[in-house]
Amino acid sequence: MKSFVLFAACMAIIALGSLAHAYPQKLPVPIPPPSNPPVAVLQNSVATNSKGGQDVSVKLSATNLGNNHVQPIAEVFAEGNTKGGNVLRGATVGVQGHGLGASVTKTQTDTKIKGLDFQPQLSSSTLALQGDRLGASISRDVNRGVSDTFTKSVSANVFRNDNHNLDATVFRSDVRQNNGFNFQKTGGMLDYSHANGHGLNAGLTHFSGIGNQANVGGSSTLFKSNDGSLSLKANAGGSQWLSGPFSNQRDYNVGLSLTHHGCGG
């Protein structure tokens, strides 16, 4: 009897082995977690204008549209002054990834909304290369009926740690105006930022045949929510002509900037 039970058990094991060989089990294919949903970022800023009124700007951009390798760029914006006058509105589209980026911006200035009649007056295109410490870009701005500007720039990270960051940028712009007055702009800028959201910048620009202009600016984070979705910044800046026909002329501005990162879909 015991031999019969042992024989039956052996036959059962062999049968199960045959079934397993004939119908092998497939391991479940791991499903990657879903990527972060797109996030809408709304930015509003108000700044003083030396000619009167307050300059107001609104920009809506979308982030997390791509993946870890490629990120599309999409934003719309509008700028105006509280005293009235022209309103600038436009849109930017582009793509960036692997240290490369390209974008195109179309804008229009008019005194009223024309609905779907979107005829750009200013067209901008940019091609940028960004590495860990060095970067370069070329851009072209065509202001229809006014000017054509071609700009080349190189940037470098001078210093960086967990709290402090210092970048340096040099550039040259060739400006051709439709009225025949052409000139070059060459200059440089230092840009410092702190991990807490504070920053300072200073630059010097030479306008060929005109003179030199110095610029300084700063910003400070006044408020930031615990989740980082809402922040309020104060900024201030000024410029002064150091030489040329505009020598000693100054311009100042102060403002506030509110940024909100909305929820994804």
UniProtKB/Swiss-Prot annotation:
- The chain residues annotated with the modification Glycine amide are 264
Q: What else is known?
A: Sarcotoxin II consists of at least four structurally related proteins named sarcotoxin IIa, II-1, II-2, and II-3.
Which keywords accompany this UniProt record? Amidation, Antibiotic, Antimicrobial, Immunity, Innate immunity, Pyrrolidone carboxylic acid, Repeat, Secreted, Signal
GO biological process, alphabetically ordered: defense response to bacterium; innate immune response
* Proregion span(s): 23-24
Residues of the signal peptide: 1-22
What induces or represses expression of this protein, per its UniProt record?
In response to injury of the body wall of the larvae.
Q: Which family does it belong to?
A: Belongs to the attacin/sarcotoxin-2 family.
Instruction: List every position bearing Pyrrolidone carboxylic acid.
Output: 25
Where does it live in the cell? Secreted
Q: In which tissues is it expressed?
A: Synthesized by the fat body and is eventually secreted into the hemolymph.
Q: Which GO terms describe its cellular component?
A: extracellular region
Protein name, as recorded: Sarcotoxin II-1
